[in-house]
Amino acid sequence: MESNTITVVACSGASNTGQYSDVVARKLIKSGQAKMLCLARFSVDKKFAEQSKAGVGKLIVLDGCPINCAEKIINETGITDFIHLNTTDFGITKGVTPVTDEKVEGIIKHIQAL
């Protein structure tokens, strides 16, 4: 994969913040700007995790809340070259902020600028 390719790993969680993470990742995929890897697979498939260390391009790890599950799981694989973002860093409050296209697009624009 080319180094300018964006690969997203997102923790979709069970709240509005996780929903933001998932929607952002899927919109990036749908637009052809990124590919997405399954977060859970990193925990259960060590071969997949090893193979993912090379050739993912720019890796964006997108968490939905301050627990930062995605970041922790990726760190456990030994992958260290990634950009970590949290939806709560964009003025989104867990359990409060409704999912809106405006906020989703704001996160996408931030990722595009990285």
Predicted regions and their residues:
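Iron-sulfur-associated redox domains of electron-transfer enzymes in respiratory
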Residues: M1-L114
